[in-house]
Amino acid sequence: MAGKRELLMLENFIGGKFLPCNSYIDSYDPSTGEVYCKVPNSGKEEIEAAVEAAREAFPAWSSRSPQERSLVLNRLADVLEQSLEELAQAESKDQGKTLTLARTMDIPRSVLNFRFFASSNLHHVSECTQMSHLGCMHYTVRTPVGIAGLISPWNLPLYLLTWKIAPAIAAGNTVIAKPSEMTSVTAWMFCKLLDKAGVPPGVINIVFGTGPRVGEALVSHPEVPLISFTGSQPTAERITQLSAPHCKKLSLELGGKNPAIIFEDANLEECIPATVRSSFANQGEICLCTSRIFVQRSIYSEFLKRFVEATRKWKVGVPSDPSANMGALISKAHLEKVRSYVLKAQTEGARILCGEGVDQLSLPLRNQAGYFMLPTVITDIKDESRCMTEEIFGPVTCVVPFDSEEEVITRANSVRYGLAATVWSKDVGRIHRVAKKLQSGLVWTNCWLIRELNLPFGGMKSSGIGREGAKDSYDFFTEIKTITIKY
């Protein structure tokens, strides 16, 4: 009889040391449905220890020059890059995404986050003005806020954790980070690299556990004046409630119900593969994924036929399979939630053209209990349907026709979210008109997911509060002060 497999045991990282926890929670391999890891079930006690460590580290770290801090960030990028393959393997196993995606996007982008903020941190300028008639000069300075509370999601675990840590410590803050309890492994591995990169103890503290226990303890702590959160709207509402008594600075990057608008002059050779990717990349578990596709009626039938054909070629497979385009969803509960949207659409009279309930999914025996789902295309669905108004966060997209430019803008803007949109057309004038009228924080035209990290990232309406990016992140992680000199 084969021996029982040993589970990976994670520990909190506080004050430069790994510390065990009194209790642990199970973490699952999404591709098999098996428990493979134990994550600390931290709470108030661990947050108190992390706050003490971050408080002690803050004076020395914040006193370092931007140049000195940037050297540390670049060393962090170096050690991450040296561990790229190991981190990619772990990210794929922990999250369910394909190993190819982890290798080519998640870990390289984590490296870039530190390199980018190491550079941008050196190029901020202050404002200065004179009032000669009063003999006064005014100028501004920015100072770090203090201890930054960072809460990152499960869909892009290390990618979004480092997107928060890098600008926070570059600006001179110390941090307490809480990754998702479902995808904590690469954050734990990251902690092992900090000493090698020369990060002083207490500058980066990572505490693992659930939102209701450790997340609430972090958000409500009076010595944590700033919270950066990426995740769901209900959790953001709770964070806002807990933060209000302390008047904390908040950055909330939430969900989306992102439209793609495809006009009759679109280049379908480019549009269709790009829209398949924007709909189903990372199992549709990216806040920027397309979940509503509006196609001008004159090309609707052709687009739909070709889009479904291309979707059926989008291979679902074991994450380690180099030919797989899609891996497993994050959890059994999430898989059931995504499937429930498809069932609801069917009861409303919508047609499922491919995917869930239509096509057969073939997997190796070991992976048949994993959380896999075929990419699913829905049509003949009303704009008021839950599938057209609520964030599904899975491999499900709806395709509907439209007639006029004005009509499609109104329909695209009809949901409570406003994170991202894509527009496909050869008419430059139309692109500018439509992009300006869309209620989205990001609009891609004739492309998707091309990011310039110097520019703002974030959404409108219920998609969040604030922006992230070079200057926006620097402004968020610092306090501005106006100084007046009488001469």
UniProtKB/Swiss-Prot annotation:
Q: Could you identify this protein by its name?
A: 2-aminomuconic semialdehyde dehydrogenase
What EC numbers are recorded for this enzyme?
1.2.1.32
GO biological process per UniProt: 9-cis-retinoic acid biosynthetic process; L-kynurenine catabolic process; retinal metabolic process; retinoic acid metabolic process
> Which pathway is recorded for this entry?
Amino-acid degradation; L-kynurenine degradation
Q: Which compartments is it annotated to reside in?
A: Cytoplasm
Residues at the active site: E253, C287
Q: What is the stated purpose of this protein?
A: Catalyzes the NAD-dependent oxidation of 2-aminomuconic semialdehyde of the kynurenine metabolic pathway in L-tryptophan degradation.
UniProt modified residues of type Phosphoserine? S362
Q: Where is this site: Transition state stabilizer?
A: N155
Provide an example Pfam family for this protein.
Aldedh
| Ranges in a coiled coil | none
Q: Which gene encodes it?
A: Aldh8a1
Among SUPFAM superfamilies, the record links this protein to:
ALDH-like
Q: Which organism is it from?
A: Mus musculus
